[in-house]
Regions:
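Radical SAM [4Fe-4S] cluster-binding motif and immediate context
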Residues: 24, 186-363, 507-518, 581
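Residues that mark the start of a beta-strand
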Residues: 2-3, 42, 213-216, 499
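Conserved C-terminal portion of the radical SAM core fold
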Residues: 38, 76-78, 106, 250, ...
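C-terminal accessory regions of radical SAM enzymes
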Residues: 4-15, 158-161, 165-172, 204-205, ...
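Glycine-rich beta-alpha loop elements in corrinoid/cobalamin-binding modules
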Residues: 35, 39-176, 401, 405
């Protein structure tokens, strides 16, 4: 049997085109591809990404799916993704029904796991797989080949019986995770992604190498914790934590390194390290493999404060090539952390950051605001912690989201904050909820402004580029050609440790005036968040410049003291052309100022008005 597996289109509902690196490729598809191929069947992959030659994402997806169906004539089509992929999956199923109405569709992934009855009944694929799908997809293929319809014999399967949805018995006693075949990325064009689109990955996954080739690996499944915002809630059938043996992980790393010659390894696990002993075991094995095979790559991982990683363990990790590790800090308020069921303390975060700074390892902190316990006081606590510890580290700031499968989602349903599921899924990646104790007029302007400033302001230390020239050897980069950018070779001395760094970045040409057009990310996103605050349709936010200016004046007229917490994000200096990266030696966050034209008066005007009116 021939099976076509279709990846979701990255940021399908947010803006086309959005270039997509292999670090965003869902590994679940690669595991499914491997299981199907190892059972003796053919696998064809379709990766509808990184093709900007269409008017819209839908037009691109329509053409790609239509061509693939005509060329490959599959016997079964597999779709999957997360809740944010709802619109893509809905459109993909409609296209398949139009072009190949007799070909069965099976849907899997997080989107089906946590709201199975609604998603299956709404999107109406022929089958759905709940939970891990490697064995189930093979059993389904065997059943389809036999011509039988004894679907009740297959656990964790959804199907249709006389027009009604039916779901078989549940069995989540999975096989030993070490017995899983390694993922097969080849059907999805990963080699081309490494060659052409590695620069599309976020900077924290590529800054250590001028020619980055990042690769991902998953060494465990599930999570032993049960944070309220996580899809693995306390009573979830899918949260059981299972980790692979270090020996098994090393075997996959060797296979990937020999095949793809990566130089940055991203360990994607929600929780790679549950205790420091496992990290030590991994580091010792990695050091041995480095010496034995001549490996040369940097790596990054995620852990939890309760893993109790100490100075000696992180020192060993650095020796083994680790350049950064991640905590989901979320909040520095004990009250909010308790409400989130994080089981962690701000003192643990501070200790970890201090150790990382001492050793010269990067620290990536994720903050999410908007928990049900969030108040003005808790925001002040978190922003005070941010100001003290986080100005020189990698950070992300976001609003908390009630994703299906989380306790927050259940709470929002009960409270009526989510009253129309179809509308919720349609705008799942475009909406922010107010679950806090704050009034809407304060919460929405504050969180949008916080996210905006954290992305575009120069609050980290800055340094001037000492060298900036065109890289003539990489003038045909696909991303550069589309955006009319140029690949530059850049040198800069770190403002923290004074060491010289060498980067390659896609930038606007020096010969062109450095002016942001109406399509610039900075001003489009700024106008977008203003229109969202006003509750207007985002599609119409360019209709009136006067309206935007008026909304901006309305926003900054808020003199609520909460806005003063944004001071650390504003930075000390005027905005100049720069890019955000990290030092390749001490791994602290830095901004590299560029010798380009500086016509950024619009952004500086915004910044000045914010500082004057909000008085920060």
């Amino acid at each position: 049997m021939k099976v076509l597996l279709i990846l979701p289109t990255f940021r399908y509902n947010q803006g086309y085109p959005s270039f997509y690196s292999n670090t965003d490729l869902p590994t679940g598809f690669a595991y499914i591809a491997s299981a199907i191929r190892n059972s003796g069947h053919d696998v064809v992959g379709l990766n509808p990404n990184n093709d900007p030659g269409y008017k819209s994402a839908y037009e691109m997806v329509y053409d790609k799916i239509s061509q693939s169906l005509l060329k490959n004539k599959p016997d079964l089509i597999g779709l999957g993704g997360l809740s944010v992929d709802f619109k893509f999956i809905k459109d993909a199923i409609q296209i398949i029904r139009e072009k190949a109405p007799e070909t069965p569709i099976v849907l899997g992934g997080g989107i089906i796991n946590y709201d199975v009855e609604f998603i299956f009944s709404t999107l109406r694929p022929d089958f759905c797989i709940v939970g891990e799908g490697e064995e189930i997809i093979v059993d389904l293929i065997k059943m389809l080949e036999s011509g039988k319809q004894d679907y009740e014999e297959i656990a964790n399967l959804g199907y249709w019986d006389n027009g009604a949805p039916k779901f078989t018995k549940q069995n989540f006693n999975y096989i030993d995770i070490d017995k899983r075949a390694f993922p097969d990325y080849e059907p999805f064009g990963i080699s081309a992604m490494l060659d052409e689109f590695s620069m599309a990955t976020r900077y924290v996954y590529r800054y250590t190498r001028p020619n980055p080739r990042p690769m991902t690996i998953v060494s465990s499944r599930g999570c032993p914790y049960s944070c309220t915002f996580c899809i693995h809630k306390k009573d979830s059938k899918y949260r059981k934590y299972r980790s692979r043996s270090i020996e098994n992980i090393m075997q996959e790393i060797k296979e990937l390194y020999d095949k793809y010659h990566f130089n940055i390894l991203i360990i994607l696990d929600e929780l790679f390290v549950v205790n420091k002993e496992r990290l030590r075991e991994f580091c010792l094995a990695l050091i041995d493999a480095h010496n034995k095979f001549g490996w040369d790559f940097d790596w990054i991982f995620q852990t939890h404060p309760n893993a109790s990683i100490d100075y000696e363990t992180l020192e060993m990790a650095k020796k083994a090539g680790c350049y950064c590790f991640t905590y989901g800090i979320e909040s520095a308020s004990p009250r909010v952390l308790a409400s989130m069921n994080k089981k962690s303390k701000p003192s643990q975060f501070a200790t970890a950051i201090n150790i990382a700074n001492t050793l010269g390892i990067g620290f990536y902190a994720n903050f999410i605001f908007g928990d049900v316990a969030e108040t003005e006081e808790t925001i002040h606590e978190t922003m005070s912690f941010f100001s003290q510890y986080c100005l020189d580290i990698h950070i992300s700031i976001a609003a908390i989201s009630p994703y299906p499968g989380s306790k927050l989602f259940d709470d929002c349903l009960k409270k009526g904050l989510i009253s129309d599921k179809m509308k919720y899924y349609k705008y799942i990646d475009k909406q922010i909820f107010n679950m806090t104790k704050l009034p809407n007029r304060v919460w929405f302007p504050w969180i949008y402004l916080a996210m905006y400033l954290s992305k575009y302001c120069q609050f980290a230390k800055s340094t001037n580029a000492t060298y900036c020239e065109v890289d003539t050897e990489d003038s045909n980069n696909a991303i550069a050609l589309y955006y009319k950018n140029t690949m530059y070779k850049i040198k800069a001395n770190c403002p923290h440790c004074s060491q010289e760094n060498y980067y390659r970045e896609l930038l606007r040409s020096k010969e062109e005036p450095f002016v942001y057009s109406k399509n610039s990310n900075i001003f489009v996103s700024f106008e977008a968040f203003l229109m969202r605050i006003a509750g207007l349709n985002i599609i119409r936010y360019n209709i009136s410049k006067l309206m935007v200016k008026g909304l901006f004046l309305l926003l900054i007229s808020f003199k609520h003291p909460l806005f003063k917490t944004l001071k650390p994000l504003m930075g000390e200096n005027e905005f100049v052309p720069f890019f955000t990266t990290c030092c390749q030696h001490c791994n602290k966050r830095i901004n590299v100022n560029l010798p380009m034209g500086n016509n950024n008066h619009r952004f500086n005007t915004i910044r000045k008005l914010l500082k004057i009116v909000i008085k920060i």
